[in-house]
Amino acid sequence: MKTIAVIGWKNSGKTTLVSNLVKFYKEKKIKVGVVKHAHHSFDIDHPNTDSYKIRKSGAYKTTLVSDKRLALMEEKITPDIQLGSLIDLNKDCDLLIFEGFKSYDELIKLEVHIKKNDKDYLYKSINNVKYLVTDDDLDHPIQTFNHSQIDKIASEIYNENS
């Protein structure tokens, strides 16, 4: 399976780029999984549902299944994230896109940057950043694209990464 991490400062366009890449790959019949890093606690389940009651009773894993969707909720015992486990959960995908995960050196990264954020480039301080998507006109020491080059970005990611 091919993997890539899309990183960048808040409001740089990461989610927009990931969504556009997913649409591009879907048209090409490439099965894409996305793992989104959340910096805050979240809950996809709701009180007064059977699954919520089961999970709150102490189930380590609760899986909801319908004819159209599957959701797995796993209670984390430790705060660390096991990259291998996330990859295993998505092993039926052709490409796995991680949104965030900039501290994971083993992932090849694509940085999304916009001038108006007035932030420095992450590739200067983060390991394994191979691509940059930006709206500036500067020369950079890594392969650079503009935000509208979705087909070129998608092709480069899929053809070069493994």
Task: Give each language-model segment a name.
Residues 3:
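Walker A (P-loop) ATP-phosphate-binding motif of ABC ATPase nucleotide-binding domains
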Residues 6:
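Hydrophobic anchor at the beta1->P-loop junction of P-loop NTPases
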Residues 10:
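The conserved Walker
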Residues 14:
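Conserved lysine of the Walker
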Residues 17-18:
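Post-Walker A alpha-helix
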Residues 22-77:
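N-terminal phosphate/diphosphate-binding loop that engages ATP/GTP or pyrophosphate donors
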Residues 74-104:
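Phosphate-binding/switch loop-helix module in NTP-utilizing enzymes
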Residues 95-162:
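Phosphate/Mg2+-binding loops and adjacent switch elements
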